[in-house]
Each structure stands twice: as C-alpha cells, then as structure tokens.
Curated annotation (Swiss-Prot):
GO terms for molecular function: rRNA binding; structural constituent of ribosome. Part of the 50S ribosomal subunit. Residues 1-45 are annotated as: Disordered. Pfam families: Ribosomal_L27A (PF00828). Binds to the 23S rRNA. It comes from Corynebacterium urealyticum (strain ATCC 43042 / DSM 7109). It comes from the Bacteria. Belongs to the universal ribosomal protein uL15 family. This is Large ribosomal subunit protein uL15. One of its GO terms (cellular component) is cytosolic large ribosomal subunit. One of its GO terms (biological process) is translation. Keywords: Ribonucleoprotein, Ribosomal protein, RNA-binding, rRNA-binding.
C-alpha cells in the first residue's frame, strides 16, 4: 500500500511550468533592444495612455466649464391645483402635512402650488410658495392661500 497523498507533497509535473523570459539580460535573452526594436519613443520609454499621437487631446478639445452651481438653490416639490381637487374633494383646510399624508409630496422638502388644471372646491391651502395663477384659482373657488 502506498502512502496517502498530502497537500504539501503536491508538485507540478516536470516541464509544466516554464520560466518567464527576462528580457534585456544578456544576448541570449533578447539582450540589447529587448524586443522593442531600435530607437524611437517606444524603445526608450512608455507613451502615456492619454497621448493621441499629436492630435489635439480630448481635454483640450472640450469647452471649459462656465458659470457655477448654486449650492443654496431651493428645489420645490410641485403640486397642481387639479391634484388638490382630486385629493381633497370635500374641501377644507390643507397643510403640507395633509399633502404628505395624501401622498402628493414628501416630508421635509418645501412645496410650491402651481395653477395647472381647474379647481371648484373651497380649500384653505398652506404651503411655502404659490404661483400667481394658483393663488387666483384657489381664491376664485372661494378658498384662501397662506404662505408658510
């Protein structure tokens, strides 16, 4: 009976692993030019990945960025008067919390009411901002507008 095979005894077969040719280490191992040919940029060192062969580089072809980004810009969530009529058909007082409960807006973000559509129910709406047409339509329907 032979001994069981052990992991630390395993070796690759003879000739299975061939050593990598180390170029440029004497004439026998591609000495002198080391497989790079003679002279020129590629023989002497590497060309950067971004080099386009003398063509105007991409970063210089593209226009410069102009202007700036206003980090203090307030982005409002939008609700139209037609949405208000659908969500509150019986009329009454409508605050931002009611709009959140109705699923029209998310909490913790300012709300602007816009005048798209028609409204016929009396609503007393409280929000951060209103467009001119939204104010006009809500007040024409007998409601009121309060900016919070």
């Amino acid at each position: 009976m032979s001994d069981p095979i052990k992991l630390h005894d395993l070796r690759p077969a003879k000739g299975a692993n061939k050593a990598k040719t180390r170029v440029g280490r004497g004439e026998a191992s591609k000495g002198k030019t080391a497989g790079r040919g003679t002279k020129g940029t590629k023989a002497r060192n590497k060309v950067p990945a971004y080099f386009e062969g003398g063509q105007m580089p991409l970063q210089m072809r593209l226009p410069k960025l102009k202007g700036f980004k206003n980090n203090n810009k307030v982005i409002f969530q939008v609700v139209n008067v037609s949405d208000l009529e659908k969500a509150f058909p019986n009329g009454g007082d409508v605050a931002v919390a009611d709009l959140v409960a109705a699923g029209l807006v998310r909490a913790k973000q300012p709300v602007k009411v816009l005048g798209n559509g028609e409204i016929s129910v009396k609503l007393n709406v409280t929000a951060q901002k209103f467009s001119g047409s939204a104010k006009e339509k809500i007040e024409k329907a007998g409601g009121s507008v309060t900016e919070a």
